[in-house]
Amino acid sequence: MCGICGQFRFDSENVSSKSLTSMMSKLARRGPDSSGKWLEGKIGFGHQRLSIIDLSSHGNQPMVDDLLKLTLVFNGTIYNYKSLRSQLIGKGYSFSSHSDTEVIIKAYHYWGEDCVKYLDGMFAFCVWDQSNQKLFIARDRMGIKPLYYNLSNKAFTFASNSQALLTQELDKSVNPLALQQQLSLHGVVPAPNTIINGIQKVKP
């Protein structure tokens, strides 16, 4: 269980390191092994790591591939990462780690958004594609790994839990429809709703 967060700003402001730190503090229990931040102007990622597959520092995140101009934060486990890694090596890609994180970066570069069709596992991740100035965010098909977001006219902000997003400026009022669902559906609020108006869940 790791924790991821990030922000992409649309206004004249750059992403604040303090803002990322605030979100990461609410994710710390999800990833006690290491933490990392990456900021580049209007985009920034934070990560709290629980080491599972590649225990070395080569698996630390946010993971930046300068050659492919991709940056990734990822929470989860890709069960078929070894076979995907072999497949991508056969297509000319090289790897500097043994992590499933790096496999996602290469898979995204090769297959684009369709990379999720090849991933067998539980995951939530976000990729910044510098070349195309595009942010891509995804969850596993069953929605095992959580991912929440806030979208305003100033920024798109995401995190592994709602507590992290509550450190940001957003509408913190209660969503009455979600409250009704919470009380009547055995505590389940279907995506994209959450109990907070300013926070949504990424659909699986």
Model-derived features: positions:
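Cysteine-centered catalytic environments shared across enzyme families
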Residues: M1-P204
